[in-house]
């Protein structure tokens, strides 16, 4: 029945310590940032920063270079969209140091979409006005992220050339 399904689901969520459950029960201090799903980390970052009980822990985690985040279900364009959102037309950033550190963590922990292949390629990125859009998946965000991702992760003569 529907009632049994909801009870089973609730029990399973309790056992795996799902972040939304901890948040709704005001158990903020029990949240472990290196264990939460990547999408949840993206969605709830403002909630973490607003709560005094966890804001300092979140800031410490963001600045700790030895700890990583789960970015297994994020695409590069989603990370770029968050970074671009914090900048104005001239590239001036209104982003906090904590947000910048977390975006860098997500970028560094993106999956290997190139499957470890060492190829000789160069990405040419179109950033003309026709590439703009209002969503995270705007063509410009996709193009920039693809160019950056490939330039950082490929080998060969074009590695790290932007």
Regions found by a protein language model. Name each.
Residues 1-142, 152-162:
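Long lumenal/extracellular ectodomains of secretory and single-pass membrane proteins
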């Amino acid at each position: 029945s529907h009632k049994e399904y909801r009870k089973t689901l609730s029990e399973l969520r309790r056992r795996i310590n799902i972040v939304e459950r901890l948040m709704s029960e005001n158990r903020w201090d029990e949240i472990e940032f290196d264990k939460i799903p990547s999408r949840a980390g993206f969605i709830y970052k403002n909630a973490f920063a607003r709560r005094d009980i966890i804001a300092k822990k979140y800031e410490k985690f963001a600045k700790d270079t030895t700890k990583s985040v789960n970015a297994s279900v994020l695409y590069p364009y989603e990370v770029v969209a968050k970074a671009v959102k914090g900048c104005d037309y001239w590239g001036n950033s209104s982003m906090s140091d904590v947000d910048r550190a977390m975006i860098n963590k997500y970028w560094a922990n993106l999956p290997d979409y190139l499957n470890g292949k060492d190829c000789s390629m160069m990405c040419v990125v179109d950033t003309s006005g026709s590439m703009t859009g209002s969503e995270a998946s705007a063509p410009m965000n996709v193009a920039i992220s693809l160019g950056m991702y490939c330039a950082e992760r490929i080998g060969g003569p074009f590695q790290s050339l932007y």
